[in-house]
């Protein structure tokens, strides 16, 4: 699973960078692990250049048993008896006249806990759209209701990849609501907006990353199975500078025990709620996945004997809310320890300007969610 962890982490940071570039001043939020597992499900049915492009974009070696690794990861992430609620749901919806292969359908169930649902896009496009939206709403406890907007499905649609994820976690150290107060959030040097800023002073893992001039804070959820990592540039450092130099290898190095040390720290973190949606086709083209979306070029012959089958639509919509109680969501470097700095009142982590954040499954070392908070 370590190979997959590195591959999915690399994919996560590449994906985050593309979304940040496309919207330089906007908020960003997505679930890279659910996107990569959904794509790997399509990879099961892909051959030739289509499969090569997808494997390369996902940083995967097709020779390895990647599907079994995804099976282990999804089982670990979705396991029962945790202190957090996390539900991932992938499903392919295919035109019923396409005659999908039973071997492909069985593999989807075995490795991805996902079934291929056959619908009649040709005869009942709008009913099919509503069916898909209802399924997603149910899987995300009503947080994501209109995944596919009106007229996004038509009689030409053949294959829709749907990817839903829902997360709700409580902090290991909750914030006290009585300390939450309005404070200015500096969007840039000219503009600021008010936010509800949470506050607590407690012991957390903290580091200062000299390479990018930023602080890195880890806020664990209950039982410390998952953590929120917040990467906050120093005052005067542009977040885009941090984004450009960020890699998964660096993030992994910065979060190692010799880099992050437990220290008493004042934490100021804004309450926020984000809901973002992305048409993944344009994003994935940036990553080199081109053929899968093109009729006549896509080779999905391990999925169906239909010659012109291609991926018609892949939409990713995600929701996150961070508050005093916790989070509700539905998507080799130099560093030194802040505790060693000479600060009279102890370290202070004040997230009153744009930052990157990651929700990590600690045991699997997997980035479940990542995003950028730029503006309230």
UniProtKB/Swiss-Prot annotation:
<dbReference type="GO" id="GO:0043066">
    <property type="term" value="P:negative regulation of apoptotic process"/>
</dbReference>
<dbReference type="GO" id="GO:0004867">
    <property type="term" value="F:serine-type endopeptidase inhibitor activity"/>
</dbReference>
<feature type="site" description="Reactive bond">
    <location>
        <begin position="340"/>
        <end position="341"/>
    </location>
</feature>
<dbReference type="GO" id="GO:0005794">
    <property type="term" value="C:Golgi apparatus"/>
</dbReference>
<dbReference type="GO" id="GO:0042270">
    <property type="term" value="P:protection from natural killer cell mediated cytotoxicity"/>
</dbReference>
<keyword id="KW-0007">Acetylation</keyword>
<dbReference type="GO" id="GO:0002448">
    <property type="term" value="P:mast cell mediated immunity"/>
</dbReference>
<dbReference type="GO" id="GO:0006955">
    <property type="term" value="P:immune response"/>
</dbReference>
<dbReference type="GO" id="GO:0016020">
    <property type="term" value="C:membrane"/>
</dbReference>
<dbReference type="GO" id="GO:0005634">
    <property type="term" value="C:nucleus"/>
</dbReference>
<dbReference type="GO" id="GO:0002020">
    <property type="term" value="F:protease binding"/>
</dbReference>
<dbReference type="GO" id="GO:0005829">
    <property type="term" value="C:cytosol"/>
</dbReference>
<dbReference type="InterPro" id="IPR023795">
    <property type="entry name" value="Serpin_CS"/>
</dbReference>
<dbReference type="InterPro" id="IPR036186">
    <property type="entry name" value="Serpin_sf"/>
</dbReference>
<dbReference type="InterPro" id="IPR000215">
    <property type="entry name" value="Serpin_fam"/>
</dbReference>
<dbReference type="GO" id="GO:0070062">
    <property type="term" value="C:extracellular exosome"/>
</dbReference>
<dbReference type="GO" id="GO:0005654">
    <property type="term" value="C:nucleoplasm"/>
</dbReference>
<dbReference type="InterPro" id="IPR042178">
    <property type="entry name" value="Serpin_sf_1"/>
</dbReference>
<comment type="similarity">
    <text>Belongs to the serpin family. Ov-serpin subfamily.</text>
</comment>
<dbReference type="InterPro" id="IPR042185">
    <property type="entry name" value="Serpin_sf_2"/>
</dbReference>
<dbReference type="InterPro" id="IPR023796">
    <property type="entry name" value="Serpin_dom"/>
</dbReference>
<dbReference type="GO" id="GO:0005737">
    <property type="term" value="C:cytoplasm"/>
</dbReference>
<dbReference type="GO" id="GO:0010951">
    <property type="term" value="P:negative regulation of endopeptidase activity"/>
</dbReference>
<dbReference type="InterPro" id="IPR000240">
    <property type="entry name" value="Serpin_B9/Maspin"/>
</dbReference>
<dbReference type="GO" id="GO:0005615">
    <property type="term" value="C:extracellular space"/>
</dbReference>
<protein>
    <recommendedName>
        <fullName>Serpin B9</fullName>
    </recommendedName>
</protein>
<dbReference type="GO" id="GO:0062023">
    <property type="term" value="C:collagen-containing extracellular matrix"/>
</dbReference>
<dbReference type="Pfam" id="PF00079">
    <property type="entry name" value="Serpin"/>
</dbReference>
<feature type="modified residue" description="N-acetylmethionine">
    <location>
        <position position="1"/>
    </location>
</feature>
<dbReference type="GO" id="GO:0043027">
    <property type="term" value="F:cysteine-type endopeptidase inhibitor activity involved in apoptotic process"/>
</dbReference>
<keyword id="KW-0722">Serine protease inhibitor</keyword>
<keyword id="KW-0963">Cytoplasm</keyword>
<dbReference type="GO" id="GO:0071391">
    <property type="term" value="P:cellular response to estrogen stimulus"/>
</dbReference>
<comment type="function">
    <text>Granzyme B inhibitor.</text>
</comment>
<keyword id="KW-0646">Protease inhibitor</keyword>
């Amino acid at each position: 699973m370590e190979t997959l962890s590195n591959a999915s982490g690399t994919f996560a940071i590449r994906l985050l960078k593309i979304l940040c570039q496309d919207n330089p001043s906007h908020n960003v939020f997505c679930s890279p692990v659910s996107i990569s597992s959904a794509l790997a499900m399509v990879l099961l049915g892909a051959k030739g250049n289509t499969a090569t492009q997808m494997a390369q974009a996902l940083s995967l070696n097709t020779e390895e048993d990647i599907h079994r690794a995804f099976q282990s990861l999804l089982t670990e992430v979705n396991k029962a008896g945790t202190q957090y609620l996390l539900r991932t749901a992938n499903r392919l919806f295919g035109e019923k006249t396409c005659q999908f292969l039973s071997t492909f359908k069985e593999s989807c169930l075995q490795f991805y806990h996902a079934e291929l649902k056959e619908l009649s896009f040709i005869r009942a496009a709008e009913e099919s759209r509503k069916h898909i939206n209802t399924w997603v709403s149910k899987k995300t406890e009503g947080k994501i209701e209109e995944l596919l907007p009106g007229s996004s499905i038509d009689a030409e649609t053949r294959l829709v990849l749907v990817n839903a994820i829902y997360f709700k976690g409580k902090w290991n150290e909750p914030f006290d609501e009585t300390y939450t107060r309005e404070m200015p959030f500096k969007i840039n040097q000219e503009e600021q907006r008010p936010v509800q800023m949470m506050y607590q002073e407690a012991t957390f893992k903290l580091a200062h990353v000299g390479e990018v001039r930023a602080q890195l804070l880890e806020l664990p959820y209950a039982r410390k199975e998952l953590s929120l990592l917040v990467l906050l540039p120093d005052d005067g450092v542009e977040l885009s500078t941090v984004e450009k130099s960020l890699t998964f290898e660096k993030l992994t190095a910065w979060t190692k025990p010799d880099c992050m040390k437990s220290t008493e720290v004042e934490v100021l973190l804004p309450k926020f709620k984000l809901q973002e949606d992305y048409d993944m086709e344009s994003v994935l083209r940036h990553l080199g996945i081109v053929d899968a979306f093109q009729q006549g070029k896509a080779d999905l012959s391990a999925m169906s004997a239909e010659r012109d089958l291609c991926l018609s639509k892949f939409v990713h919509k995600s929701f996150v809310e961070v508050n005093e109680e916790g989070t509700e969501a539905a998507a080799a470097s130099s560093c030194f320890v802040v505790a060693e700095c000479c600060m009279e009142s102890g370290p202070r982590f004040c997230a009153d300007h744009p930052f990157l954040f990651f929700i990590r499954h600690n045991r699997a070392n997997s980035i479940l969610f990542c995003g950028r908070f730029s503006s309230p």
